[in-house]
């Protein structure tokens, strides 16, 4: 998706920027569901297949630890499983948006929830939960799987605690990263 967005933006620049960012995002929606977001960037609420975007305020200063397990996940398979099962819970999207608008980092973290975690195969779910447990044990305000996974992220208000989680996780998972919001 990010590659497609870069190509669209590059072609737009090469042709004298005839399309607005919103027009480019709409065009990107025909290529893939995540392309509009990658064209526009920033913080946004994605609805529909991910192509309907509402800009939101940026998170307050924070640090993230991202950890990608070695297994892969089939996005179509997970969507089929979500459609086939009764979900235990749903994210509090309205509450999360309100917390973002209020600049309440802890409120955002409390509302992080990913329904795809509920339908992961048992072995993969166990790995995701182990990573979440490490992040939370180091003081993450919240931890969740990103999208259809398998990357798991933790949201921290303290860089030293985030660094501790990163140090522990990188011993077991090569693709573990420490970063802050831009």
Regions found by a protein language model. Name each.
Residues 1-21, 37-41:
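DPxDG-like acidic metal-binding loop motif
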Residues 10-27, 158-171:
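Phosphate-handling active-site elements
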Residues 26, 30-31, 46-55:
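Active-site glycine-rich loop that binds ribose-phosphate moieties when present
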Residues 49-142, 157-170, 174-182:
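Conserved, helical-rich catalytic subdomain that frames metal- and/or nucleotide-binding sites
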Residues 150-152:
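Conserved glycine-rich beta-strand-loop-beta hairpin in the small C-terminal domain of fold type I
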């Amino acid at each position: 998706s990010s590659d497609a967005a870069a190509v669209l933006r590059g072609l737009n620049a090469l042709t004298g920027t005839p399309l607005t960012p919103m027009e480019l995002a709409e065009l990107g929606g025909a290529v893939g569901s995540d392309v509009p977001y990658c064209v526009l960037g920033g913080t946004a609420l994605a609805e529909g297949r991910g192509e309907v975007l509402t800009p939101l305020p940026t998170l307050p200063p924070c640090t993230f630890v991202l950890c990608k397990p070695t297994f892969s996940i089939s996005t179509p398979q997970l969507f089929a499983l979500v459609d086939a099962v009764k979900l235990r819970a749903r994210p509090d999207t309205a509450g999360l948006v309100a917390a973002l608008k209020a600049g309440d980092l802890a409120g955002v973290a409390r509302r992080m929830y990913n329904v795809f975690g509920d339908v992961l195969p048992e072995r993969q779910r166990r790995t995701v939960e182990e990573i979440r447990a490490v992040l939370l044990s180091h003081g993450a305000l919240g931890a969740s799987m990103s999208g259809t996974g398998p990357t798991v992220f933790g949201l921290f208000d303290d860089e030293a605690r985030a660094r501790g989680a990163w140090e522990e996780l990188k011993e077991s998972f090569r693709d573990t990263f420490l970063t802050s919001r831009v």
